[in-house]
């Protein structure tokens, strides 16, 4: 006779045995993951500490500068494998600078949480999302969503702070005037009254108005060409937000404004526009066009890689002399953040 089993699966004691073992292994896995996260976070912090201490070790090391992380990435990867690319090392360094004392790191958050938090340009903003992530037990995806929706800035500007937090905790995407659409970068940049509510299209129009006026008033050779400049590329229609011609540099300047974080695709799209201008718009005696992608947040490494293609060093020097520096443009967007300390 075939033995189909030694136990009765309907037996309560047997079901309890299954439940106990399942619970045991679930807790064990959870503890293991927590332990791994703790060790990973501490190791990343310590790595950042080593890098900063090395940088501060003397003048010669300081002059080693930007090549340090590039060389470290190559050598550490060769010896230890993946996980030590330049971007990761940059964020490990940022982690130490943001949290100089290891004891202030909360192990309730993962390295992926800190990776997103360290993208904040403003310490106050980072601390806000840091505390909210712990308090509300946000997963990484939820943290990214809240940051993208500019929860910190909307909360700082709103008189109904509890209402804004309630909307955020409900997972509600702010998309209409009734949802308190208030982007602090746009409001400050465009000089709009804070008490009024605007549609997203109104805010973007005001932002472009202000950017256009800002560049023209700088008196550095900018001539306005057009807004929402249309380009037919293949079978598709594209539009770039603002186009200027720089009379001193003898080149077109294309500007794309992004309300959220600048993505790799935004840089690629700008490169597409630049190639179009080189082929279809520029005259033989024009210099290559310049593209500026401006957003609420930026990844310095991404921006650096995106500008790698400029090889004419003389042209780059004139670019730095006559065009507004990246910091000048970003300052126009970030200005309000300095005024929010007393608002929260």
Label each PLM-derived region with a short phrase.
Residues 1-344:
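Basic, low-complexity intrinsically disordered segments
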């Amino acid at each position: 006779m075939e033995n189909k089993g030694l136990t009765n699966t309907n037996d309560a004691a047997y079901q309890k045995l299954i439940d106990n073992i399942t619970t045991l292994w679930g807790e064990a896995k959870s503890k293991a993951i927590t332990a791994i996260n703790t060790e990973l976070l501490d190791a990343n912090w310590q790595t950042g500490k080593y890098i900063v201490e090395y940088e501060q070790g003397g003048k010669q090391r300081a002059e080693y500068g930007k090549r340090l992380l590039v060389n470290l990435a190559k050598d550490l990867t060769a010896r230890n494998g993946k996980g030590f690319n330049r971007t990761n090392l940059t964020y490990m360094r940022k982690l130490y600078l943001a949290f100089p004392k290891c004891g202030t790191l909360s192990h309730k958050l993962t390295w992926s949480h800190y990776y997103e938090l360290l993208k904040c340009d403003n310490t106050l903003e980072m601390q806000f999302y840091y505390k909210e992530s712990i308090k509300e037990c946000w997963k990484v995806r939820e943290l990214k969503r809240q940051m993208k929706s500019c929860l910190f800035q909307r909360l700082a500007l709103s008189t109904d702070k509890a209402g804004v937090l309630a909307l955020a905790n409900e997972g509600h995407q702010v998309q209409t005037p009734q949802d308190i659409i208030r982007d602090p970068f746009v409001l400050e940049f465009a000089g709009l009254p804070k008490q009024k509510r605007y549609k997203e299209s109104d805010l973007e129009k005001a932002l472009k108005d202000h950017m256009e006026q800002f560049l023209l008033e700088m008196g550095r050779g900018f001539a306005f060409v057009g807004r929402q400049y249309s380009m037919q590329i293949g079978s598709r229609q594209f539009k770039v937000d603002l186009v200027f011609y720089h009379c001193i540099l003898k080149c077109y300047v294309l500007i794309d404004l992004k309300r959220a974080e600048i993505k790799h695709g935004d840089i690629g799209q700008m490169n597409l526009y630049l190639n179009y201008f080189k082929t279809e718009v520029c005259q033989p005696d024009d210099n290559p066009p310049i593209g500026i992608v401006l957003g609420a947040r930026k990844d310095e490494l991404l921006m650096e890689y995106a500008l790698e293609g400029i090889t004419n060093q003389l042209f780059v020097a004139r670019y730095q002399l006559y065009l507004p520096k990246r910091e000048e443009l970003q300052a126009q967007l970030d200005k309000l953040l300095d005024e929010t300390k007393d608002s929260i």
